[in-house]
Structures are given as structure tokens and as C-alpha cells.
């Protein structure tokens, strides 16, 4: 099971990858939205913002997020690490329910370029 530190590092790596992206991926990463990433097996939520092509984590809280972020991810810690490391295909994980992504329709259309 991934630790909180490993999950935070995975989010940082994802953020770095997004900032270095080009083309459609860079455009999708340019959104300015609130973000939450709930790690179910650790019962922790990373709260932050997607801005300037990066995910900036502002807070880590126990349990579910107190407010609904504009972009919401939910998954196990190992799945987050595997996704960022390229060992888990997002589409398959999302289709099987291992990973949940919730956002407005317009944001979902943009985010599919990222994922």
C-alpha cells in the first residue's frame, strides 16, 4: 500500500509532467480549477488547484473533502502511483471503476487529453 508521502510525490510528478507537456495536453493542463484527489485506502484527500499547468496541493486532510472541488479524483494510493508511473492505463482503470473522475462536462472533455 502506497504511503501518503508516495501519493504526494506521485501528484508532484504528475504536476511536473503536465507542466512539460506540449500541444493539446498543455492546453488541457492550462485549466484553472479546484482539484481534490481522494485516496480511499489511506482515508486521506489532497486538496489543491490546477493552475498554470500544474497541480498545486494546498492541504492534505483526513477523510473525504469538506467541499466539492471542480475536478475530483478518487482511487487507491497504489493506483495513483501506478497511473503516474505509466504502469496503469487510465481508460481501463476508469472503465473498471478503479479510478473515478468527476468534473463538469466541458472539463471532462478537456481532461481526456491529459489522461
Predicted segments, located by residue:
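Feature captures hydrophobic
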Residues: 1-115
Amino acid at each position: 500500500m502506497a504511503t501518503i508521502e508516495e501519493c504526494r510525490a506521485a501528484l508532484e510528478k504528475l504536476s511536473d509532467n503536465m507542466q512539460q507537456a506540449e500541444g493539446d495536453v498543455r492546453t488541457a493542463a492550462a485549466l484553472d480549477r479546484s482539484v481534490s484527489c481522494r485516496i480511499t485506502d489511506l482515508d486521506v484527500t489532497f486538496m489543491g488547484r490546477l493552475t498554470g499547468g500544474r497541480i498545486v496541493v494546498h492541504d492534505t486532510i483526513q477523510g473525504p473533502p469538506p467541499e466539492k472541488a471542480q475536478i475530483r479524483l478518487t482511487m487507491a494510493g497504489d493506483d495513483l502511483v501506478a497511473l503516474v508511473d505509466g504502469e496503469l492505463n487510465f481508460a481501463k482503470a476508469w472503465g473498471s471503476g478503479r479510478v473515478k473522475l468527476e468534473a463538469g462536462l466541458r472539463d471532462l472533455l478537456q481532461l481526456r487529453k491529459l489522461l
